[in-house]
């Protein structure tokens, strides 16, 4: 079965379930990004942030998976993607923690566009890690690929929406989310084939360094934010 052909055989059903489960299993980080990005916009805009951001992410994943073999031949692509995730984590921290609810409302349209951009960017980078597994299960079937994504993405969006509500109640979850995104970014850098073939680090070392980076980025943000607040307090008000 290739291309757009399909039949409701057991083989089709098994592959379909396989793709759906792989998408769900590998999309935990993506749900966190969606939740953090949605929490950065006023509540009345959150549904559309998740719908537009998630919808664009679906289209991008389909394109990515269809050209998975080509993508994996680009040197350092996974490492660059990991680096971009640090930027995404920092941006989300700045908006979710650095802005009050009033500022979010005042900058509603700007934050809405930024949130969608961050969702799509992070999903693109994180999906670089996932496309080979999904493409392998699809065995060249576009129908299987699209069907699996259409089933898994609504669940991903729902999870992202739930995370945004939790962040409203427990702001410290933003730091947990940033730590997880940083952990994923570090792992992507060290597991890039180009870097891996030169450093030859063990899985344990990669995990330890990834955990440390997951702690360091939020810690640096907290230090930076407190320093900024101290400087603002010392500055004479006009």
Regions found by a protein language model. Give the residues of each.
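Multi-pass alpha-helical transmembrane bundle typical of ion/small-solute transporters
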Residues: 1-238
């Amino acid at each position: 079965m290739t291309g757009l052909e399909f039949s409701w055989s057991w083989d089709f059903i098994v592959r379909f379930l396989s793709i759906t489960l792989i998408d769900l299993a590998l999309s935990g980080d993506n749900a966190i990004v969606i939740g953090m990005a949605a929490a950065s916009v006023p509540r009345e805009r959150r549904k559309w942030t998740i719908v537009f951001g998630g919808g664009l992410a679906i289209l991008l994943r389909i394109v990515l998976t269809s050209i998975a073999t080509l993508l994996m031949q680009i040197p350092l692509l996974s490492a660059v993607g990991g680096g971009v995730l640090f930027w995404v984590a920092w941006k989300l921290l700045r908006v979710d923690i650095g802005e009050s609810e009033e500022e979010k409302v005042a900058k509603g349209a700007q934050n809405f566009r930024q949130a969608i951009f961050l969702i799509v960017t992070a999903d693109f980078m994180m999906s670089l890690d996932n496309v080979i597994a999904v493409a392998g299960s699809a065995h060249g079937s576009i129908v299987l690929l699209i069907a699996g994504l259409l089933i898994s993405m609504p669940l991903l969006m729902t999870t992202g929406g739930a995370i945004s509500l939790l962040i409203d109640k427990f702001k410290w979850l933003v730091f947990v989310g940033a730590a997880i995104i940083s952990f994923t970014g570090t792992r992507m850098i060290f597991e890039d084939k180009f870097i891996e073939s030169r450093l030859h680090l063990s899985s344990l070392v990669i995990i330890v360094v990834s955990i440390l980076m997951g702690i360091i980025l939020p810690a640096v943000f907290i230090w930076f934010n407190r320093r900024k607040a101290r400087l603002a307090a010392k500055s004479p008000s006009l």
